Amino acid sequence: MGLMRETFREEDHVRLHNVIRKAGDVINSVPDEAVIETKVRAASLEAIRATQEKIDRAYDGATYAFGGKIKREPLKGYIPVIHRGADEVMKESVELLDATYRCSRPSDFNNACTDVGDLTHLFPVLNFTFGGFAGKLHGADFRITDEELAYIKPAKLLALTIYHLLRDQAKEAKKICREFKPVFNKESYCQYIRDNFSENE
């Protein structure tokens, strides 16, 4: 699997993470059962599928090599986020708050995983972040450094954006929904889960 990484394309941003959950019950003995969890992250569903196929072949080959058996239990992970630029109504709201901002670009790839990725395949989602803190996200040194910037301005931004979306009988909100082209609807999303995350022997 280490050598397999050489086949990944840079633009796919593939990441593999292995965790050995069980490796036998006694020392100095070949285990009767070993359990490993492999996590795949990538920039698209296609890249995840292609990587998963390579991983499956690697495990199949290793299992065949020592005459063992393999049982797979696919686990559902987050789907990659589809980039969507800031709507004019949000930009208008930021400017009313006299705040500075930078619009993200598709090239600003973030390897973090979030359930927002699933939502972007179904709805017009705008994922934004804000300041007012220091340290590593989810880290022991994370701390709030500016309460106005961390709490108050984001709340005002959301309230103003909602107002701008709903004014004039929700004209802007309806326009965004009308122009959005989802990857899945509810039924096809559920079918994707069933097709890709059922047990395989």
What are these regions (language model features)?
Residues 1-88, 94, 107-117:
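Midchain, well-structured core segments that form catalytic/ion-binding scaffolds
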Residues 8-12, 66-70, 101-102, 166-174:
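Surface-exposed helix-capping loop/turn segments at secondary-structure junctions
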Residues 35, 59, 64, 78, ...:
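Sequence-level detector for tyrosine residue identity
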Residues 54, 89, 153, 157:
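Charged catalytic carboxylate motif
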Residues 90-92, 129-130:
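Short, flexible segments with low predicted structural confidence
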Residues 103-201:
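Zn-dependent metallopeptidase/amidohydrolase metal-coordination segment
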